[in-house]
């Protein structure tokens, strides 16, 4: 077994905790799927490499070890001195590889929140987290106390501050801020919904077809409102730091080094899903068959998304790469920039004119012409065309039945939040009640101030060091289209640069465009 990953509460800082979580993520990571880190595929893992340990200490003389199953990042056991304790649902091999040479005991409860909460006689929302809770838990485990209620409560603290924090940037950030400010916190509705949907989000990403989840995942924001996630390009996906391994994408290039027998055992994602969804784009409008007319050659337009799901705004993403409404195909009239897009009978249309690929970044491209779906007109009813791909905001799309903007605050360097001030934007102390800190993230990739959704975050020029300001969205420019990535960056596709707090100095009151360095002044998080 590798050496344990260590964290001490003594002299702990938000920085020492951040380093601990990063080391843990690194140890748990198996590979990347859709550019998002994923736990190892269990079929490629030998049983003896299945477990890792984390050492949590209050001082040189007071420490415990926690055993984690790398296939699911679950806490399966802990050791205090010469005694170790295994959860009831720990895999049978856990006791063969973890804490051998100690007296091994079985705990009376499972590692699920439902069971732990029953034994603790408290829900997760009632149990405070933070440095003090962790320090207390380490001391209690180390003392060998026999109170099962307290054991369950302590495990709820450790699981969330260690395992859940490794899975989600949102959760590690909550813990980090609590260490920074020296205050305890109780999990909010967003945090609980992430914990409860980790497997659903992981499955959605890995089984996604044409940038779209087979089934929508319903998260909750801090105001207890539903947030529906059904696309890889939904900004909430960027809070995932590690996914559960579900399956390999059907077309994944299998490494030739993997032994054939292992590859055959390994689970490949089904490609049978053909989701039927809306396609949201420019200004949050929907791709719409004009006037509900399904005769060949009728144009496809942008129209406001209807309150109810209606046929002429519903599209089935077929495995043959066609996109169909009412059984007919989304078809480009030609292969030259400016060709209009129409509805057409799939069997009589030129096949290549009906094929589309939806990229993870929200681009919809016709492979034959290499042109992309574009909403050139900002007015409702404007006809869709294919155009040269320039990653313009008017060429950004997000599939899913919920195409409404995701409203959130955005935290960044030094745990400050992005704040609108007239046409400027800078960093200020976070206050979730401040309208100037609320941002609406649209289907077209734009980031808009909720105070005036006609204003978009825009980089002033296409060059390194350009200031980011609020400018009219009606331009639909490339400098107004952003991607929230899992490395924490807010990325401009056209410029291949990211949002950066200038000079790591918030007092300069400037956010600029800069090449990605991965430094803290380029790391952002949607706070739900």
Curated annotation (Swiss-Prot):
1-beta repeats: 326-366
Pfam families named in the record: Ricin_B_lectin, RIP
1-alpha repeats: 283-325
Reactions the enzyme catalyzes: Endohydrolysis of the N-glycosidic bond at one specific adenosine on the 28S rRNA
Xref: CDD domains: beta-trefoil_Ricin_abrin-like_rpt1, beta-trefoil_Ricin_abrin-like_rpt2
Residue stretches of each 1-gamma repeat: 369-401
InterPro entries referenced in this protein's UniProt entry, alphabetically: Ribosome-inact_prot_sf (IPR036041), Ribosome_inactivat_1/2 (IPR017989), Ribosome_inactivat_prot (IPR001574), Ribosome_inactivat_prot_CS (IPR017988), Ribosome_inactivat_prot_sub1 (IPR016138), Ribosome_inactivat_prot_sub2 (IPR016139), Ricin_B-like_lectins (IPR035992), Ricin_B_lectin (IPR000772)
Positions of the catalytic residues: 164
Pyrrolidone carboxylic acid modifications at: 1
Chain positions of 2-beta repeats: 453-492
Key word Transferase present: no
2-alpha repeat ranges per the UniProt record: 414-449
Residue ranges constituting the Ricin B-type lectin domain according to the UniProt record: 273-400, 403-527
The family this protein is said to belong to: In the N-terminal section; belongs to the ribosome-inactivating protein family. Type 2 RIP subfamily.
Protein name, per record: Abrin-a
Biological source species: Abrus precatorius (Indian licorice)
Lineage, highest ranks first: Eukaryota, Viridiplantae, Streptophyta, Embryophyta, Tracheophyta
